[in-house]
Amino acid sequence: KKIILCLIAMGLSVGAFAQNNEFGVMVGGFNGLSYKRIVNEKFAIQTDLGVGLQATAFNIDGIAGSTHLFDFVINPNFLYNKELKSNIYAFLGMGINLGLAQELNIPEMTYGKFGVNAMAGFGFKVQKLPLSISLDFRPGYAMLFYSSFDSLINIFDWHLALGARYCF
């Protein structure tokens, strides 16, 4: 019995120090829940689910006009991580966003949303605590569509967000 208990304790302690999973919140231009899975020392997958509040729309002539969107999206990203110093890292990657968007000044218009984005930022893992803090910038391009792609709106979609995640 003691050997089995020792093996279980060793297995749990190794798993506790691996900390390949992170779950937390993002606040800023993008607000929501965030999950990050460290695949290996260079790559990670981060998926965020939440709401955003800004975008720039372009009309058919390519002229920019300001639009204020409230959107609800899921945003999976593939990231390259680079450790800069102990517990400080930079990341760069890309992803897609899928969801719904609504113009704040026209509440009866709800659009489907599909887009691609880049993602760049910095992160910090707090020593002796299972906590990761990050700051990221996500410029992107998205299309808003209404009723079977009858109406397409192109937007420059960008978000700046601060994240805090529990590492496990």
Question: Model features per residue range: what roles?
Answer:
Residues N20-S34, G52, L69, S86, ...:
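Solvent-exposed loop/turn segments connecting transmembrane beta-strands
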